[in-house]
Design a protein with these regions (language model features):
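Phosphate- and divalent-cation-binding pockets in alpha/beta enzyme and binding domains
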Residues: 48-51, 75, 93-94
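Acidic, Mg2+-coordinating phosphoryl-transfer loop and its flanking beta/alpha structural elements
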Residues: 85-119
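Conserved Lys-Pro-Asp/Glu-containing loop-to-beta segment of HAD-superfamily phosphomonoesterases
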Residues: 73-90
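Short, solvent-exposed coil/turn elements at secondary-structure transition points
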Residues: 69-72, 107
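Alpha-helical substrate-recognition element adjacent to the catalytic core
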Residues: 1-70
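Short low-complexity, flexible loop/linker segments enriched in glycine and/or proline
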Residues: 54-56, 80, 100
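Alpha-helix boundary recognition
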Residues: 32-33, 77, 96
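Hydrophobic anchor at the start of a short beta-strand
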Residues: 38, 63, 82, 99-102
Length: 119
């Protein structure tokens, strides 16, 4: 869960930061200033870290680590990340209960007219 006094926070890029850049700009800055370590975890093509860094700079996102992986759950457990923001269930479905997950609602994962999550 928590490592010493430092929370490790994972944040997805596509469908998360990209949809709410103003919130995540403020959030990542505040959390980093509070001593948290911010991981940007994205399932982009391997070798695109510099493109991701440029996009994060454009959004004004504060971060410490960029990780490109399709197996986010394994990376999160390996690094001891205790909080995740993501929009896609399959990335966090197999995380242990100790990892707090904040799911981002989008048209493709939430039916706003019926007020229910989509499968």
């Amino acid at each position: 869960m928590q490592t010493g006094d430092t929370y490790k926070i994972g944040v997805d890029l596509d469908g998360t930061i990209s949809e709410y850049p103003d919130f995540f700009r403020l959030f990542t800055k505040a959390m980093a200033e509070a001593g948290c370590k911010i991981y940007i975890i994205t399932d982009r093509p391997p070798g695109t870290e510099s493109d991701v860094a440029a996009e994060l700079h454009h959004y004004g996102i504060t971060y410490h680590v960029i990780k490109i992986t399709s197996n986010k759950a394994a990376f999160i457990q390996q690094e001891g990340i205790s909080v995740l923001f993501d929009d896609m269930d399959h990335y966090f479905r197999h995380l242990p209960q100790e990892v707090a997950v904040f799911k981002i609602r989008q048209n493709y994962n939430f039916d706003f007219q019926r007020s229910i999550w989509r499968d």
